[in-house]
């Protein structure tokens, strides 16, 4: 097995899905958290001048958070078991990522850094907030129905085994639910799924000991 280094800011953000996959698999990795003050001097050294970035054996670099997550999910057994199931895990995960991405863009500064603060919530542009809200309105009903397609939505998205898709349901909605506890009020299956992820033995252990960050 290769050695892994995950490069990202000291946030959950777009890297948390990878941290959850490492935790679910019980695989050790170097969680390299970069302070915002360091980013200016490091940016040009990163693929596409962006993070997160996953590094294997200190030589292979994988950018793009969902490409990283899919790689780890396949490596660790948290993806689909055949091509159709993999497509299902992918489109569910990418749908949750759309919500996460639109939410985070409300709080980006011009250099791509998060400027999230409870006292500055209203500084997010109305256009970006409207886009985020519309994304939620489009995607939540679809994901609720998609979850119900397997065992009435009473287990995980792929049945009785947790996958990347379920972890994305949890991590993509952490901060949105802090802002608005009612966003899943009309989607009880999704809310119950998040609780199953929280109570999954590996996830529960990880969530209790992980670093506490604002976003």
From Swiss-Prot:
Q: Does the keyword Acetylation apply?
A: no
Q: Where is the GST N-terminal domain?
A: 2-80
* Tissue expression pattern: Lens.
Biological processes per GO annotation: glutathione metabolic process
Pfam families registered for this protein in UniProt: GST_C_3 (PF14497), GST_N (PF02798)
GST C-terminal domain residues are 82-215
InterPro entries for the chain: Glutathione-S-Trfase_C-like (IPR010987), Glutathione-S-Trfase_C_sf (IPR036282), Glutathione_S-Trfase (IPR040079), Glutathione_S-Trfase_N (IPR004045), GST_C (IPR004046), GST_superfamily (IPR050213), S-crystallin (IPR003083), Thioredoxin-like_sf (IPR036249)
State a single Gene Ontology molecular function.
glutathione transferase activity
Keyword Iron-sulfur listed: no
| Gene3D superfamilies per record | 1.20.1050.10, Glutaredoxin (3.40.30.10)
- Keywords in UniProt for this one? Eye lens protein
Q: Which family does it belong to?
A: Belongs to the GST superfamily.
What is the role of the protein in this entry? S-crystallins are structural components of squids and octopi eye lens. Contains relatively little if any GST activity.
PANTHER family membership: GLUTATHIONE S-TRANSFERASE
Q: What is the name attached to this protein's record?
A: S-crystallin 4
């Amino acid at each position: 097995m290769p050695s892994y280094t995950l490069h990202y800011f000291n946030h959950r953000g777009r890297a948390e899905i990878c941290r959850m996959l490492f935790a679910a698999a019980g695989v050790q990795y170097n969680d390299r958290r970069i302070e915002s003050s360091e980013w200016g001097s490091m940016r040009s050294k990163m693929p596409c001048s962006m993070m997160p970035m996953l590094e294997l054996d200190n030589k292979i670099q994988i950018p793009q958070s969902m490409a990283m997550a899919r790689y780890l999910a396949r490596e660790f057994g948290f993806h689909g078991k055949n091509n159709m199931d993999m497509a299902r895990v992918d489109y569910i995960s990418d749908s949750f990522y759309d919500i996460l991405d639109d939410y985070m863009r409300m709080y980006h500064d011009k250099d791509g850094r998060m400027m999230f603060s409870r006292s500055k919530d209203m500084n997010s542009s109305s256009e970006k907030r409207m886009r985020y809200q519309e994304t939620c309105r489009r995607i939540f009903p679809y994901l609720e129905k998609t979850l119900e397609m397997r065992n009435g939505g009473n287990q995980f998205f792929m049945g009785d085994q947790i996958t990347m898709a379920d972890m994305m349901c949890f991590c993509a909605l952490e901060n949105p639910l802090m802002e608005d506890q009612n966003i899943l009020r009309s989607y009880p299956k999704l809310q119950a799924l998040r609780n199953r992820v929280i109570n999954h033995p590996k996830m529960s252990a990880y969530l209790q000991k992980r670093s506490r960050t604002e976003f």
